[in-house]
């Protein structure tokens, strides 16, 4: 009888060590040192002694998981969410909000200080309540054949599997209260095996729900969903395709910002944390010190989150955005709020904005709010415009540091830095920086 050779699977034994953690990175991992290199520890906090299982050992760093806390930090708190140990939505519920904010501010300071070797201090932190803040969420839906049940929730940590959640304490209370009845009605649908995801949004006009379904819904399923929307007083949208949206009940959503009404589509980007967003916009207005003679350019303007409030104080404001649908919505909101001094344009922001017809008169103040990739291609154009003040709103401190260096080597100085705690209990770090021309 022929025998075939097969290589045996390499057996690896995880090393367990005891370390003292001295720092917390912006992602909520404890930082220690072992064998002359950094060790990032999930579940450990500064000043804690922990037993750690090494799960990854690289040349310059290692990663581990705290298996036992020998000496606990006074900043350690009990996670409020019953799903925290598995759900990948939050990473820092075991740390006090104060420690989370201080650690993110330190990380921001380090990244901004590194390029020039000069210490850049974070002036202050804009924050709000750490629970019940999230006004938007997308929940995955997955039917489990073995148990014949529907799972609804977020991805598991380091996995593509869904954690079936019954509550989420970071959601707005109105949305959190919908989770269990929503799961029940979705589980009762004939199409339960062919559902993609559900989006929940809490607008100032009320709650709304978007259901992505992969097959056509029966009349009975549609009736169930419509009855649910009336019972819970929410606007219902159905999405048979990723690029389609059918409104079944309710009105179009809107939110208030600085005495303005901003309407939006369920698929439009809005800031998740309304309280921090309101403070952020107010801070930007204060830093720009808007005067009646000012001409302001708002780059990556979206649907006018900053542009429209600025229009109340400046002579002219121009918002520029690459997505046509957002430009159209922003223009509609300008008309709705009778802001005749605000204009919106669609433009590829990698191209020279200073040469466009709407830029002929120039701008003395600029605000930009780019995506995570930053605005490297835009910075040279801003320098050509030569505004007196620039406010940079960032969702990625690494690209912020890179783009800041371009301004700092072109006659600008850094005046103020604020950390925005837009997403408590997560590793997301947002910030805003004020630059002025020397």
Curated annotation (Swiss-Prot):
Keywords assigned: 4Fe-4S, Iron, Iron-sulfur, Metal-binding, Methyltransferase, rRNA processing, S-adenosyl-L-methionine, Transferase
Signal peptide, first to last residue: none
Record-listed S-adenosyl-L-methionine binding positions: 271, 300, 305, 321, 348, 369
Chemical reaction(s) catalysed: uridine(1939) in 23S rRNA + S-adenosyl-L-methionine = 5-methyluridine(1939) in 23S rRNA + S-adenosyl-L-homocysteine + H(+)
EC number: 2.1.1.190
InterPro entries hit by this protein: 23S_rRNA_MeTrfase_RlmD, MeTrfase_TrmA_AS, MeTrfase_TrmA_CS, NA-bd_OB-fold, SAM-dependent_MTases_sf, TRAM_dom, U5_MeTrfase_fam
Molecular functions (GO terms): 4 iron, 4 sulfur cluster binding; iron ion binding; RNA binding; rRNA (uridine-C5-)-methyltransferase activity
Pfam families: TRAM, tRNA_U5-meth_tr
Active-site residue numbers: 395
GO biological process assignments: rRNA base methylation
The keyword Ubl conjugation is annotated on this UniProt entry: no
UniProt-annotated binding residues for [4Fe-4S] cluster: 81, 87, 90, 168
Enzyme superclass (EC): transferase
Domain TRAM: 10-68
Protein family: Belongs to the class I-like SAM-binding methyltransferase superfamily. RNA M5U methyltransferase family. RlmD subfamily.
HAMAP family for the chain: 23SrRNA_methyltr_RlmD
Function comment: Catalyzes the formation of 5-methyl-uridine at position 1939 (m5U1939) in 23S rRNA.
UniProt protein name: 23S rRNA (uracil(1939)-C(5))-methyltransferase RlmD
């Amino acid at each position: 009888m022929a025998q075939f050779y097969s290589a045996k699977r390499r057996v690896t034994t995880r090393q367990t060590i005891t370390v003292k953690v001295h720092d917390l990175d912006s992602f909520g991992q404890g930082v220690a040192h072992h064998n002359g290199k950094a060790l990032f520890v999930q579940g450990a906090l500064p000043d804690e002694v922990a037993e750690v299982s090494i799960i990854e050992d690289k040349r310059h760093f290692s990663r581990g998981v705290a298996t036992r806390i020998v000496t606990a930090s006074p900043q350690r708190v009990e996670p409020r969410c019953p799903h925290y140990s598995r759900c990948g939505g939050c990473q820092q519920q075991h740390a006090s909000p104060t420690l989370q904010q201080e650690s993110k501010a330190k990380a921001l300071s380090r990244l901004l200080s590194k390029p020039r070797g000069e210490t850049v201090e974070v002036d202050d932190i804009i924050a709000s309540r750490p629970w019940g803040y999230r006004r938007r969420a997308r929940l995955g839906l997955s039917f489990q054949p073995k148990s014949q049940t529907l799972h609804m929730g977020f991805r598991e940590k380091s996995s593509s599997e869904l954690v079936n959640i019954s509550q989420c304490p970071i959601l707005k209370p109105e949305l959190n209260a919908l989770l269990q009845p929503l799961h029940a009605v979705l589980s009762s649908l004939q199409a339960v095996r062919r559902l993609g995801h559900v989006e929940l949004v809490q607008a100032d006009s009320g709650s709304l729900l978007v259901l992505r379904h992969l097959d056509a819904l029966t009349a009975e399923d549609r009736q169930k969903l419509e009855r649910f929307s009336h019972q819970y007083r929410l606007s219902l949208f159905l999405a048979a395709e990723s690029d389609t949206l059918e409104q079944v009940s309710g009105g179009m959503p809107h939110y208030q910002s600085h005495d303005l009404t901003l309407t939006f589509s369920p698929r439009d980007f809005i800031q998740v944390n309304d309280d921090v967003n309101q403070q952020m916009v107010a801070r930007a207005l204060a830093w720009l010190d808007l005067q009646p003679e000012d001409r302001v350019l708002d780059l990556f303007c979206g649907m006018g989150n900053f542009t429209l409030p600025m229009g109340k104080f400046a002579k002219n404001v121009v918002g520029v955005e690459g997505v046509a649908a957002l430009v159209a919505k922003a223009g509609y909101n300008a008309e709705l709020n009778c802001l005749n001094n605000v204009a919106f344009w669609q433009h590829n922001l990698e191209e020279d904005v200073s040469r466009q017809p709407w830029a002929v008169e120039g701008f003395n103040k600029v605000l930009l709010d780019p995506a995570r990739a930053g605005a490297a291609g835009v910075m040279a154009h801003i320098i050509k415009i030569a505004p007196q003040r620039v406010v940079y709103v960032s969702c990625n401190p690494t690209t912020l540091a890179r783009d800041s260096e371009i301004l700092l080597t072109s006659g600008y100085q850094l005046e103020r830095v604020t950390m925005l705690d837009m997403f408590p209990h997560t590793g997301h770090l947002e910030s805003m920086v004020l630059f002025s021309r020397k």
